[in-house]
Amino acid sequence: MLNFTPVTAEAMTLLRPYYETCTYRLCEYSAGVKYMWRDHLHSEYAVTDGCLIIRNRLDGVTQFDYPIPGPGGDVEAALATVEDDCRQRGVRPIFSVVPESEAGKLALRWPRVTITNERVWKDYLYHAEDLARFAGRRYSGQRNHINKFNKEHPGAEFIPLTVEDSALLETFWADYGAEFQKQSPGAKRELALAQEMFTHLDTGIFRAGGILWQGRLLAVALAEKCGDTLVCHVEKALYSHAGVYPAMVQLFAGYYGGDCRWINREDDGRDRGLRTSKLQYLPAELGGKMRFEVGCELDALRHIPELTTERLTLSPFTDADKASYNALCLDDQRNRWWGYDYRTDLKGPLTEDYFLDVTRQDFENRIAINFAVRLEGQCIGEVVLYNGDWRGSMEQGCRIAPEYAGHGYGTEAFAAVADWALYQLGLTRVVAKCYRENTPSFKMLSSCMRHTRDDETFQYFEKLV
């Protein structure tokens, strides 16, 4: 499994090389957003296959950003690694804030996936030249506001801000606080986070500036260049100085946007006033952020079906199977070939309901389906489909109670479920494995699957038709 580390101030310098060349144009693909909103996003990072992997946890739900490649990074391999990490953790892969440019690849990647693309998530993207010039009739309103500001504030100038300007910034935040009208906890928290971002100017990650007039700052902004996009994390100005906001937008874009094609002024946070303001600056595009929640073929089932063969019935486990199923699960001698020790996941005392409860919970979560193998109504074993790869393949296993071994029941049950999985459930592939020294299982699997490869421990099989 991947090892994730929480995003901290120190981590920003580690994330920055990936975001510095990132071409996704969305604000979430920046070190500043990951750090500024760390308590909301609960972001953690890992590196695999030459790509940065960000895992967030929102409202208790784990979700990933789209992989950000470094030099030579393999996004396809990174996606597969994340899928495998989710499989091992027993959670479904969810990729959020996926840029529209990459969405087509993901839409074709998984057989079952739910896609969401909401207006409220979209970033406001502007041509850098448009904001730096405000040229043409469509920007006449902004120019009028700026002309008024310049007339009322002769000598006002834009200055870059560095760590040496802490005194100026301290005075500005005091002035801004005196005018700040919003009383909601969220607004107050956002202001505190904005102030904190200016304490990290020594990292070299951010571009910051302000409008200085008569020795005091009237406006400040802080941004981060990611690929060809300047992502504006903070914009604050004193409302009492009419026209200061459009003046700041233009001056900041003119000073820092020369090496950028795009300026991202982030989303509107579902705020009517922010949406109105951002639209007035005439965005060239709204940067879509798409969410992909990956499903599996088991999602289509309302209940576990009943299958029949010449001698057997395969159906859901019932309470009447408790004793026989517990005996099957507790047979350590036989289960050494099963490849799984229940003690690994057991938390607390082992109860008589534990094993049946696990099968029911796994099906409820649609991560596995367990069939009881019945001979004349008696439970003599199980066949399980589990370990899905989210791309149309699942692993299958079978075990038969020792007193019923040697009669071909395992082969009969295994073949029936494999056929059902391919032609009724709709899987693309069923895979299985057995220990190299497990000759009976090798013979069973060879009779109904294709032997594909071996390693030092296992022999592997697959069934496509």
Model-derived segments and spans:
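Aromatic (often tryptophan-rich) hydrophobic motifs at membrane interfaces
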Residues: F206-E293
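Conserved active-site alpha-helix within GNAT-family acetyltransferase domains
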Residues: E102-I115, G269-L286, T411, R436-R453
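Acyl-donor (CoA/ACP) binding surface of acyl/acetyltransferases
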Residues: L14, L217, C226, I263, ...
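A short beta-loop-alpha structural element at the N-terminal edge
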Residues: L2-L14, R137, E157-T171, T313-A327
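Conserved donor-binding loop and adjoining core beta-sheet/short helix segment
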Residues: E28-P99, L212-H241, L385-R391
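Conserved acetyl-CoA pyrophosphate-binding loop and the N-cap/start of the following alpha-helix
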Residues: D74-A78, S240-L251, Y404, G408-V417
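Acyltransferase donor/substrate-recognition loop-hinge adjacent to the catalytic core
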Residues: P111-K182
